[in-house]
Amino acid sequence: GERGSGRGRPRGRAHAGVRRRDFFAVNRDGALAIARAVGRVAPDARFVLVSSLAAAGPAARGAPLSGGEPPRPVTAYGRRKLAGEEVVRAGPLPWVILRPPMVYGPRDTEVLRLFRLARWGVAPVFGRGDQELSAIFGPDLAEALIAAGTSPHTVGKTYLPCHPEVFTSGALARQIGTAVGRDVLVLSVPEV
């Protein structure tokens, strides 16, 4: 095909110059370096690591994670986050780990995109829209972080801070439509 037409075979490939091991270095080695540096200047400090729900892996349908399950990450991102958790647990400082899910609220641009699309009457979802999700409001996560860093009962524990209700991506799409005053067409986007 013609160059730039989008037709025919690709003539090259895009590469951002980032390698998988670089991501591991940030999540694992970066967390360890910070813990060691803080340990040198403030050996009694508490390390509060913000990880990700992806480190835990998926829950069984209809059964949200409790936090006591062994981690089973299924993505490279989740495995990187788990590697960071492991070095913090083995590190020199008392620790607390939080595994937040999707965060929404002030300054969030990802969920904001869904609201903008809903204003046009469109709400994309992956697959059939039955993917179960959990979320936390940004200011609620901030409160959880403060509690994790100050409560004497949190040391050595891993928390899954989230809204107690699990919802589907289709329900989220319809709820966003309601919030912007539109009936939305929920469009199924193929999962990759």
Give residue ranges: language-model regions.
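Conserved beta-loop-beta element that borders a ligand/cofactor-binding pocket
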Residues: 85-106
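Substrate-positioning beta->alpha
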Residues: 109-113, 127-150, 156-160, 171
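Alpha-helical membrane-targeting segments
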Residues: 113-138, 183-192
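Glycine-rich NAD(P)-binding loop of the Rossmann-fold in SDR/ketoreductase-type enzymes
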Residues: 22-33, 79-80, 136
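NAD(P)H-binding glycine-rich loop region in Rossmannoid oxidoreductase-like domains
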Residues: 1-29, 55-58
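Conserved Rossmann-fold NAD(P)-dependent oxidoreductase catalytic core, especially the SDR/UDP-sugar
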Residues: 32-76, 96
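Mid/C-terminal beta-alpha module of Rossmann-like enzyme folds, strongest
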Residues: 148-192
